[in-house]
Structures are given as C-alpha cells and as structure tokens.
C-alpha cells in the first residue's frame, strides 16, 4: 500500500491511497465516522435559566459544541472502575453569565464555559450558546464524557469523511478537434491546451462527470474517462476535537484489533 499526502492541517487532510480495494478503504471510512471516541457534553445540571430558551434546547446546544479531546487522559465511562463518574472519565464545565442592568442584551459564547481541566475546552471560542436580555442570568454545570458517533452525532469526530476512485482520462489527440470547446465545457478545469494539443491538467480535480467523453462522440470517441483500479483519493475533515491523522491512526488500530479478535476466535475453535 502506498500513501501520498496532498493536503494536511489540524482539521483537514487529503491523500491518495494505492494498493488496496474499496472494501478496505470503505471500512476505514466507516470507522472514522462512528467508532472514534471523542468528548462531548452528555449531562447538564441547570441551576438557573432566565433566558427565553427552553432548558432542553439549551442542553442540546451544549452537547453539540466540539470539545478538544485528550484520549490519553480519559477513558470511556463503561471502561472506568468508578460507578458515578470521576476525573478519569468525566470533565466538568461551569457556566455562570448575566446580562447586567443597562445592557440591552448579551450573547453567551462557548468561551464562557470554564473547564476543570485546562487541556479540555471547546474547540472554538465563538459558538453562540444563548442570548440573555437585561437582568437575565444563566447558571449551569455541564458534564462531558467520551462516546462514539454510533451512539449520537455529537460524538462524531469527523464532519466529512469520504473517498472517490482515482480518475483516468485517455485522449486520442489525433482525433480531437475544437480544443477550446473541450476546455470550456470541462466543469472542473481539468483539460488544458499545451502546444496546440489537448492534455490533462490536474487529474485529481476530475469528478468523472464524463462531459468531455460525451462531447468527443463527434470526434469518433476520442476521449475515454475511467478510473484507476485500487487507487483512491481520500478526504477527511474533523470538527477540531481530534486531528485528521490522529483519527486515521485510531481507526487503523481499531480495525487491527477487530482482525486480531477474529483470528483469536478462530484459533480457539480449532
């Protein structure tokens, strides 16, 4: 298997994978979507809420705030030895804000959540939680714990995770006429003209829409659009709780563990 990185930052990664089949790459995709543990607010104790927003809506909005996840310091509640929650499986956030007299309104943001662990905090500071009017106050405690995307979308580490087959375009340059027309009709600007010859530019931008192939019917099917066997373009974006390649590493570890469990089961049955 060969991997070539095209883009990489703290929230997005694009890379080309070669030498695997779609069953393997789709398994990695599904694990990234629903089996990567992340921190999210699960329980909310509301002590005071003068805002017009219902308690249930407020709690729901808190649950969807992405939280920086430290998998080395926390474990899933089901794997913790405690019975009621402890510092190894839960993180507490306190929120106490008031719109003082003389102010028309005040927006409470995610940055106003105060964590008892400095390393665990909302990924973004400017997520609006609730608007308070003059004299209104909100006070609550929010408890975050690890969970899986298969249980609730708030625990999904990835916002986008998918792949496409690596495109392939074959051009019979001796048959192609009206080169400018092909360039203009390509919606992804893949085709270019170099030295009076129609060539493929950035092939990875191709969506295999086959517009050029249909257009080439007038030129005796001079263009054929297909895809490479066992070669894919994989894209992954996270909500910031984990970095993309951390998600991929964990996904591969999970897949390896599943394979080991099957091997051990088979060996025990023999």
Swiss-Prot record:
GO terms for molecular function: 3 iron, 4 sulfur cluster binding; DNA binding; DNA-directed RNA polymerase activity; metal ion binding; protein dimerization activity. It is found in: Cytoplasm. This is DNA-directed RNA polymerase subunit Rpo3. Binds 1 [3Fe-4S] cluster. The keyword RNA-binding does not apply. DNA-dependent RNA polymerase (RNAP) catalyzes the transcription of DNA into RNA using the four ribonucleoside triphosphates as substrates. Disulfide bonds: none annotated. Its EC number is 2.7.7.6. It catalyses: RNA(n) + a ribonucleoside 5'-triphosphate = RNA(n+1) + diphosphate. GO terms for cellular component: cytoplasm; DNA-directed RNA polymerase complex. NCBIfam families: PRK00783.1 (NF001988). Its cofactor is [3Fe-4S] cluster. Transmembrane segments: none annotated. Belongs to the archaeal Rpo3/eukaryotic RPB3 RNA polymerase subunit family. Keywords: 3Fe-4S, Cytoplasm, DNA-directed RNA polymerase, Iron, Iron-sulfur, Metal-binding, Nucleotidyltransferase, Transcription, Transferase. The gene is rpo3.
């Amino acid at each position: 298997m060969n991997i070539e990185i095209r883009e990489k930052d703290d929230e997005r990664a694009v890379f080309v994978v070669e030498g695997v089949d779609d069953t393997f790459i789709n398994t990695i995709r599904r694990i990234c979507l629903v089996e990567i543990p992340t921190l999210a607010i699960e329980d909310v104790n509301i002590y005071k809420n003068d805002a017009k927003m219902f308690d249930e809506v407020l709690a729901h909005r808190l649950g969807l705030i992405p939280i920086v996840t430290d998998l080395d310091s926390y474990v899933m509640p089901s794997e913790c030895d405690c019975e009621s929650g402890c510092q190894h499986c839960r993180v507490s956030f306190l929120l106490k804000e008031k719109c003082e007299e003389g102010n028309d309104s005040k927006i409470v943001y995610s940055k106003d959540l105060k964590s008892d662990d400095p390393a665990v905090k909302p990924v973004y500071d400017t997520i609006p939680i609730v608007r308070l009017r003059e004299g209104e106050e909100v006070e609550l405690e929010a408890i975050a714990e690890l969970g899986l995307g298969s249980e609730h979308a708030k625990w999904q580490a990835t916002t986008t995770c998918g792949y496409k087959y690596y495109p392939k375009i074959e051009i019979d340059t001796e048959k192609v006429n009206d080169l400018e027309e092909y360039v203009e009709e390509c919606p992804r600007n893949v085709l270019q003209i170099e030295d009076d010859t129609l060539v493929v530019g950035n092939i990875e931008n191709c969506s295999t829409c086959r517009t050029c192939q249909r257009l080439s019917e007038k030129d005796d099917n001079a263009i054929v659009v297909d895809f490479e066997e066992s070669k894919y373009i994989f894209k992954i974006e996270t909500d910031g709780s984990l970095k993309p390649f951390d998600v991929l590493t964990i996904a591969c570890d999970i897949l390896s563990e599943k394979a080991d469990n099957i091997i051990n089961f088979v060996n025990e049955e023999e």
